[in-house]
Amino acid sequence: MATTATPMGAEPTDTLSASGSFTGKVRHIKVASGYGTAIFYGDFVKLVNTGTVEKDTGTTTLTPVGVFVGCAFTSPTTGELTFSQTFPASTAASDIVAYVVDDPNVLMRMQSDEAIAQTGLGNNVAVVQTAGSTSIGRSKNAVDGSSINTTNTLPLRIIDFVDGPNSAVGDAFTDVIVKFNAGHQYSNTTGV
């Protein structure tokens, strides 16, 4: 039972795309040298007008291009190519590349910050933004369970519940499967 709060951000698990096959494919998108915010595995990221990605810090609205699942850069300390689950804030390197699951139809596992009943299925929710874990390199973002509503501008929609030995509908910190509801940058008619 999900009786302990252990949010891990958005974990891409599947897709609603016509192919029906989730491959975990990522797009490589640059991060600006010296960008001042850490980005953790499972954080939402957005494109900005410099042609790079930044952490999307929205809660009731997001404009995501996808989910950050790691990065690569030449370490300014060692001079070695570094692969990491986390982008360390203010890293100065000219070759920083984020790995982003950018499928607008991706399904993601997330934990709620409170219990969600079966009646939450099909409704929309906001995001709770929290600083990531530097010890494990994971996002600590969660679904805002108190925001469940039909509001069409909320960024995520509950598609399913994670049902298993450690998770069930209505648990104190319910694990859910969500999709982007509104705001994905590939669906917007205006540019960045």
Where are these regions (language model features)?
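Surface-exposed, low-hydrophobicity beta-strand/loop segments enriched in small/polar/acidic residues
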Residues: 1-192
